[in-house]
Amino acid sequence: MYKRQIITRGLYEIKKLGIALGANHDTFTGLSGIGDLIVTCTSNHSRNRNAGERLGKGEKYNQILENYLMVVEGFDNCEAAVKLSNKFNLNLPIINQVHQVLFQNKDPKIAMTELMNRSAKSEI
């Protein structure tokens, strides 16, 4: 239901963190940025998408990982992104909410409601 908002705001957060780390702004509008994000978010074969959907339905982190023989990069990357956002004093609401769902047992429905109730502002 909120897929377009999450993808758009998610790209903004990824870009914000990447630029803080010294990345080129243009990287995020090309194949390795938005191109990869679109495939990850829309492909039925994406481990990260499937794991995220399961997380959103209430499955716990450890339950999800038990079913994968390969790495679900998004889970580990979420932990690193939160640490980096704290280091650079960045406000990354999606990353923080996902982290709370993954590692602090926050209800995913509450996390989504909090994200969608945020004030609208420029995402460029």
Name each region found by the language model:
Residues M1-Y2:
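Short, small-residue-biased leader/transition segments that mark boundaries at the very start
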